Amino acid sequence: MKQFSSNTQSGFTLVELIVVIVVLGILAATALPKFINVSTEARVASVNGVTGALRSAVSLVQAKYYAAGNTAATTVTMQDNSTVTVAAGTGIPAGTAAGIGAALQSTEGFAVDYTTATAVTFRPTNGGGANCQVAYDGSTGLVAQPVTSGC
């Protein structure tokens, strides 16, 4: 009868472990730039998303304004009972927090500058600047083309 030795050891050799570490390092080095680019793409998508939301909000407020039939009114009560400040005669949301800010209902994730009512800017709070924003004109109701060159 053959006896087995209890001194035999099994495992990975040092060369095998080094090869695995090198392969993992190469994979990590090629994947990292792709993840960095994703955050830029996310900011661009978020600016484009708020652009669409602004245009929709203006249209909805104006539709509700004209449906109410009072073209002298300076506020519009929306379906959820929120009040939006508008320009009398046109129903365009004002370039204020009580105007376009209330029409959007949420500006979470954006720094909004209401300093100039004719150029209200929406910038992502995480990495937004002058080259990563969209502007709203409270006098005309127009939403400018988004600027995404610096997101």
Give the positions of each predicted feature.
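Internal alpha-helical transmembrane segments of multi-pass membrane proteins, especially GPCRs
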Residues: 10, 16-19
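Hydrophobic alpha-helical bundle architecture
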Residues: 36-40
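N-terminal leader/signal peptides at the extreme start of proteins
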Residues: 1-12
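Short glycine- and Lys/Arg-enriched binding-loop motifs that mark or flank ligand-binding interfaces
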Residues: 7, 21-24, 48
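Conserved Walker
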Residues: 13, 30, 45
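Periplasmic/extracellular, small/polar-rich flexible segments of pilin-like filament-forming proteins
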Residues: 63-151
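Membrane-proximal N-terminal amphipathic helix
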Residues: 42-68
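Alpha-helical hydrophobic helix detector
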Residues: 18-33
